[in-house]
């Protein structure tokens, strides 16, 4: 294999180019015959009935007073206008039928142009269908055709992009922080020990200390030694000196 594959289907139809129909186009004999036929049929089968119907409706509206007549010419201007509108409406309504007549002509450039234009307008469904078949053929054939470059690409490791933060440092990833891992806080370890003393224990402790201080005040035997030892009487001379007897 040369690395290239022909994805064109063997039974695929090659679209023919649309013939250019310009102002200098000379119609064929068949096309002239169809033109004359369309002109006659559109006149007798569409224009005349619509023109006559429009004139009758207009005359009826004038006679009922819905439409006013001309003071000098009466209803003639409105009837002529209704006839002209019916004539052109009949011609326009026959255009689609005349196009179908040209499409049925085999060796007609004008008919081929009309058929190609209709195929172009209705091409999206077929276009997507052919495109899906083309994609399936590409995927089916590319599975058998491999190149060294494709093998090297498959052997390369796949890396996932790391998201970067939009903070002060743009080059730092969002998952990385600058803080240092610290050890356990000693205050956190001591806090549970302090919380072991309950309110009841503290209350009992305060009550015991209060009772001890109260007994020391009331019981003379518990008083300190310097309070129980009586003071010695000393004599003082006129100069303020003391002596024992």
Curated annotation (Swiss-Prot):
Pfam families registered for this protein in UniProt: OCIA
Basic and acidic residues composition-biased segments? 190-210, 224-238
Residues annotated with Phosphoserine modification: 108, 116, 123, 191
| The OCIA domain, residue ranges | 1-112
What does the entry note on its domains?
The OCIA domain is necessary and sufficient for endosomal localization.
According to the record's subunit comment, the protein's assembly and interactions are: Interacts with OCIAD2. Interacts with STAT3.
Q: Which family does it belong to?
A: Belongs to the OCIAD1 family.
What protein does this entry describe? OCIA domain-containing protein 1
Species assigned in the record: Pongo abelii
Q: Which gene encodes it?
A: OCIAD1
